[in-house]
Each structure stands twice: as C-alpha cells, then as structure tokens.
Amino acid sequence: MNKLLERHGINCEIDRWRDRGEISQLIGHKVVDVHYDDELFQILTETHIFTLYHESDCCEHVYLQDIAGEVSDLIGNEILKAEESTSGENPLCCGEESFTWTFYKFATIKGYVDLRWYGSSNGYYSESVDVVVTKLNK
C-alpha cells in the first residue's frame, strides 16, 4: 500500500484508525504524485498522503471500477473540488444482496477526474471506501 511513499523516499506509517478523514480535506492541497490500482487510489501532496481503499472484513468486495478524466491533470495542480457521493442503484450483477457505488469528483484548473468505486456484499459487511489522511513527517 505504500508504493507511492517508497517512490518518493518518504518513511511514513499509514494508520487507518488514527488518520481516518474526509475527502474534502484535499481541497487546497497541491498534488505531487498519484498511484492507483483496482483496490487503492493514493494522492501525495506536499504535506499529506490521501489514501482511498477498502479494509476488507470477510464477505464483501470493493474495488475501483472506473476512472473518467486524466489522472495526470491532478499532478502539479491545486485541488479546487473534492467531493464524495454514493448510490444504491444499478448493480453490476444480478442477484447481489447488497451493493454501493461510491463516486469521488476531483477538480483542478486543468479539468476533472471522477473515480467510480463498486462494493458488494451479503448485506452484513461494509461496502464503503475508506479515506485515510496521513500527515507526512518531514
């Protein structure tokens, strides 16, 4: 989970319980770099690392389903908008007992980047995306 930190030679421990945050905290930060795969999206700023992922318990699956826009438009620019919304409509598969879409919208002077996360479960486990905001030790 710390590939972005390793790439920049930063030694910092991400603690999902201590550093739980809101995506709106990203507004006003200048983005240095971004790393993502289907289970993780990290944004490194000059002072913090913002990590979006899902801490799995048992019987759920949450993943980054789609990205609209150019992620590179975030790098080197200040975040002007950072919003989260969710929807419980239009499941990807039929027969899923419970599902949640989670959307993140980021804006810079260069454009928008939208993330679409999809979570499904048996109805007893969280399908939400965890947002962890960690202050860098410099």
Describe each PLM feature range.
Residues 1-138:
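Surface-exposed, interaction-prone regions used to assemble/regulate multi-protein complexes
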